[in-house]
């Protein structure tokens, strides 16, 4: 089954962008996933192709119109489409590796890239949009966030990563940050590769990596400890 991504945006030329390269790009060419970037302005009805208006109650900036966006969503996601409808938004629920895995296991996603001050709340409610955030910071639009989300999802699709074990050992997959990595040369500016990693004792190596992952998580992301069954 091909993972189908439909992105609603004012800047379709931003796609596939970096997703046309490396793992995601090869998977796109192979048909493992598909991408359509839909111009929201095509669903405006006035000669100026207006997609926004002033906020009710006053205030700075502009708000994206519910009627225009609804037509765009209905075009991308007609009745019977089971793909989740996502709105990239700084006030959304933080994107987690668990949610990424859920999306990768599904048929695809319809992604709305917000602009200006945001989207009319009525659209979010009536079209059942899931608001998603990639972090506690503000971007100029939802497009970079959509690229981040899709990159995280596509790499988990079957056959995209050459070594499935590589993905299983990454940060967040087991509730911990990933352990440090080393490779040749053996010595670099006075620092040696930890001896245990060249010992050939796989049990000791696994224990060292787990210990390092736990230590890094305690130092940098203590909020993760206890939140995942494998991190306890």
UniProtKB/Swiss-Prot annotation:
<keyword id="KW-0963">Cytoplasm</keyword>
<keyword id="KW-0949">S-adenosyl-L-methionine</keyword>
<dbReference type="InterPro" id="IPR029028">
    <property type="entry name" value="Alpha/beta_knot_MTases"/>
</dbReference>
<keyword id="KW-0808">Transferase</keyword>
<feature type="compositionally biased region" description="Basic and acidic residues">
    <location>
        <begin position="211"/>
        <end position="223"/>
    </location>
</feature>
<dbReference type="InterPro" id="IPR016009">
    <property type="entry name" value="tRNA_MeTrfase_TRMD/TRM10"/>
</dbReference>
<comment type="subunit">
    <text>Homodimer.</text>
</comment>
<dbReference type="GO" id="GO:0052906">
    <property type="term" value="F:tRNA (guanine(37)-N1)-methyltransferase activity"/>
</dbReference>
<dbReference type="GO" id="GO:0005829">
    <property type="term" value="C:cytosol"/>
</dbReference>
<dbReference type="InterPro" id="IPR029026">
    <property type="entry name" value="tRNA_m1G_MTases_N"/>
</dbReference>
<comment type="function">
    <text>Specifically methylates guanosine-37 in various tRNAs.</text>
</comment>
<protein>
    <recommendedName>
        <fullName>tRNA (guanine-N(1)-)-methyltransferase</fullName>
        <ecNumber>2.1.1.228</ecNumber>
    </recommendedName>
</protein>
<feature type="binding site">
    <location>
        <begin position="134"/>
        <end position="139"/>
    </location>
    <ligand>
        <name>S-adenosyl-L-methionine</name>
    </ligand>
</feature>
<keyword id="KW-0819">tRNA processing</keyword>
<dbReference type="Pfam" id="PF01746">
    <property type="entry name" value="tRNA_m1G_MT"/>
</dbReference>
<keyword id="KW-0489">Methyltransferase</keyword>
<feature type="binding site">
    <location>
        <position position="114"/>
    </location>
    <ligand>
        <name>S-adenosyl-L-methionine</name>
    </ligand>
</feature>
<comment type="similarity">
    <text>Belongs to the RNA methyltransferase TrmD family.</text>
</comment>
<feature type="region of interest" description="Disordered">
    <location>
        <begin position="211"/>
        <end position="232"/>
    </location>
</feature>
<dbReference type="InterPro" id="IPR002649">
    <property type="entry name" value="tRNA_m1G_MeTrfase_TrmD"/>
</dbReference>
<dbReference type="InterPro" id="IPR023148">
    <property type="entry name" value="tRNA_m1G_MeTrfase_C_sf"/>
</dbReference>
<dbReference type="GO" id="GO:0002939">
    <property type="term" value="P:tRNA N1-guanine methylation"/>
</dbReference>
């Amino acid at each position: 089954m091909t993972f189908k991504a439909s992105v609603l945006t004012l800047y379709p030329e931003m796609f596939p962008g970096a997703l046309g390269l490396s793992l995601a790009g090869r998977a796109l060419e192979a048909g493992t996933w598909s991408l359509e970037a839909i111009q929201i302005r095509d669903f405006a009805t006035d000669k100026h192709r207006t997609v926004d208006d002033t906020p009710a109650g006053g205030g700075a900036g502009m708000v994206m119109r519910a009627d225009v966006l609804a037509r765009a969503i209905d075009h991308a996601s007609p009745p019977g489409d089971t793909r989740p409808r996502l709105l990239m938004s700084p006030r959304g629920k933080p994107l987690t590796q668990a949610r990424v895995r859920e999306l990768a296991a599904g048929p695809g996603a319809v992604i709305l890239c917000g602009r200006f001050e945001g989207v009319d709340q009525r659209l979010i409610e009536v079209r059942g949009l899931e608001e998603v955030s990639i972090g506690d910071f503000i971007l100029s639009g939802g497009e970079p966030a959509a690229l981040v989300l899709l990159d995280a999802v596509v790499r988990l699709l079957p056959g995209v990563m050459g070594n499935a074990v590589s993905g299983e050992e990454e940060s967040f997959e087991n509730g911990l940050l990933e352990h440090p990595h080393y490779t040749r040369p053996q010595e670099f500016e006075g620092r040696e590769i930890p001896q245990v990693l060249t010992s050939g004792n796989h049990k000791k190596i696994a224990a060292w990596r787990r210990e390092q992952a736990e230590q890094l998580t305690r130092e940098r992301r203590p909020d993760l400890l206890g939140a995942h069954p494998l991190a306890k």
